[in-house]
From Swiss-Prot:
Keywords carried by this UniProt record: Endoplasmic reticulum, Membrane, Sarcoplasmic reticulum
Stretches the record annotates as Disordered: 1-118, 157-331
Protein name per its UniProtKB record: Junctional sarcoplasmic reticulum protein 1
Localization in the cell: Sarcoplasmic reticulum membrane; Endoplasmic reticulum membrane
Subunit structure, interactors included: Interacts with CACNA1S, CACNB1 and calsequestrin.
Family matches, as PANTHER family: JUNCTIONAL SARCOPLASMIC RETICULUM PROTEIN 1
Region (Mediates interaction with CACNA1S): 3-76
KW Coiled coil (keyword) present: no
Source organism: Homo sapiens
Record's compositionally biased regions (Basic and acidic residues): 21-35, 61-71, 222-242, 250-302
Keyword Endoplasmic reticulum tagged: yes
Protein function: Involved in skeletal muscle excitation/contraction coupling (EC), probably acting as a regulator of the voltage-sensitive calcium channel CACNA1S. EC is a physiological process whereby an electrical signal (depolarization of the plasma membrane) is converted into a chemical signal, a calcium gradient, by the opening of ryanodine receptor calcium release channels. May regulate CACNA1S membrane targeting and activity.
Bias (Pro residues): 103-112, 161-175
Basic residues: compositionally biased ranges: 320-331
Length: 331
């Protein structure tokens, strides 16, 4: 009975756990082994019971005890069978619970992008393409906008005649001090008066000297006139630099030239006739002095033919060469 009570306690305490089920199965196997062992003992005890009946009544006590033991043992066997029958329905729902575990619910799927974003599926590449298209459109619009007013301005512009840049008005600068034209020292008037009184002879030295002096005087007069005109015009207006005024150098005192003693003029007959100069300068207006022939040189002179440089002795003796030539052919 103690064994049965322990089995009951173990079964009651182990319900609903895997370890209790394993222990219960082990106990059930041991109980089945024991139950199978009891009929073997009963069969083995029946043979001596027949022999004991034949021997005598003294021996009848043993078989009774033997019959009681299987009867006593039989009762726990029926109890074990009852336990098995009662335990089996309890263990089955525990196994079913372990097998039929509720599956884990999958996480809810993320919401679609089309529901949240109004523009739908967009990526970085699409954004870059859109930005580049917008930039191209803006640059093209700007170019068209700049080209239209440029063409209108070119059509409206009229070619103006070229005007030379007028000189800007300059400040009136103080006129520079006018330098007096330095005239060459005039010769003493006495010899000039004498030259005017004397008649000019074309073949004389005085005429040649006068002809040489005339162009010099004419050039001197022309230079004076040019200087006077420049002085009247005044110096050109130039931007004057502010600074110290120029220091005027003291002029050197003009020293009168010493009069050279003039050679005594010889009478015309005593002089050797000298040919007048073939050409002379004539002073004309504008300073142009072409060559002019003298009145005497109206007819062109004939140049002397070339004369061989022969000695006069050879000319006087024309037969001298002939004699020499004749002498060459001697034997």
């Amino acid at each position: 009975m103690s064994m049965t009570t322990r089995a009951w306690e173990e079964l009651d305490g182990g319900l609903g756990s895997c370890q209790a089920l394993e222990d219960h199965s082990a106990l059930a196997e041991t109980q089945e082994d024991r139950a199978s062992a009891t009929p073997r003992l009963a069969d083995s005890g029946s043979v001596p019971h027949d022999s004991q009946v034949a021997e005598g009544p003294s021996v009848d006590t043993r078989p009774k005890k033997m019959e009681k033991e299987p009867a006593a043992r039989g009762t726990p066997g029926t109890g074990k069978e009852r336990l098995k029958a009662g335990a089996s329905p309890r263990s089955v729902p525990a196994r079913k619970k372990a097998q039929t575990a509720p599956p884990l619910q999958p996480p809810p799927p993320p919401p679609a992008l089309s529901e949240e974003l109004p523009w739908g599926d967009l990526s970085l590449n699409k954004c870059l393409v859109l930005a580049s298209l917008v930039a191209l459109l803006g640059s093209a619009f700007q170019l068209c906008r700049d080209a239209v007013p440029g063409e209108a301005a070119l059509q409206a512009r009229v070619p103006e005649p070229w005007v030379p840049p007028s000189s800007a008005p300059r400040e009136p600068s103080s006129p520079l001090p006018k330098f007096e034209a330095q005239a060459p020292p005039s010769a003493p008037p006495a010899p000039r008066a004498e030259a005017e009184v004397r008649p000019k002879i074309p073949g004389s030295r005085e005429a040649a000297e006068n002809d040489e002096e005339e162009p010099g005087e004419a050039t001197g007069e022309a230079v004076r006139e040019d200087r006077v005109t420049l002085a009247d015009r005044g110096p050109k207006e130039r931007p004057r630099r502010e600074g110290k005024p120029r220091k005027e150098k003291p002029r050197k005192e003009e020293r009168p030239k010493k009069e050279r003693p003039r050679k005594e003029e010889r009478p015309r007959a005593a002089r050797e006739p000298r040919e007048a100069l073939p050409q002379r300068w004539e002073s004309r207006e504008g300073g142009h002095r072409p060559w002019a022939r003298d009145s005497r040189d109206a007819e062109p002179r004939k140049k002397q033919a070339w004369v061989s440089p022969r000695r006069p002795d050879e000319e006087q003796r024309p037969g001298s060469r002939q004699k020499l030539r004749a002498g060459k052919g001697r034997d």
